[in-house]
Amino acid sequence: MKITYKINIYNLLTYLLVFAIIKPYFLPAGLRQASKIIILISVFLFTISREKKERIVNLSWLFSGCVLLSAVMAYLKGGYHDKDFLDALLYVVTFYDIYSFIGLCKQKDRFNETIKCLYNIVGLYCVLTFVSILLVGTVNNSNQSAYIFGNKFTSSYLFIFFVALYGASHEMILWKNKICYIALFISSIALTLYIGCATATVTLAVLFIATIVPFQK
């Protein structure tokens, strides 16, 4: 009996885009950079090949253009080395890719599926991060490669992203989802307190308060 698997290109590119942005630090630096470049170019080409011509130039160009202009000026004045300038270019492409690819998914009625894909991959990242925190502890966790996906700041922000994605991908009118949502908030706050990331703790606390306090018009 032959078993076939269908891989949706939008889902695949969503997973790859997250991998390009949040790379595991156990990989060699050269491999991380090369994979990021390949993925960003692939997402860029895929997006502009399927996007309407009038939508290729969008609002993301405003921010990306400012970053690119400042990078060029810094490079010409000697403030940036070649690596710094390359990082700035990749940042520009990353911002454009995220904005334009999500917009394309919205047009193709794939936005909810994209959110679910983001929830799944970020959830996996959080599980791996939690394991690495248990193994490494909190000593010198400001170091960029302290945990599997970066230092205490990057690791904490992953959990903020995950909590937000849970709220976006689940129906909050259901009590079981509300309970899980609150549990995620509490556990994430506890984790950020443990590894000493005050900014993430405050952010999660504010989001939690905003979630439980009813909005008054």
What are these regions (language model features)?
Residues 1-217:
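Hydrophobic transmembrane helix bundles of membrane-integrated enzymes that assemble
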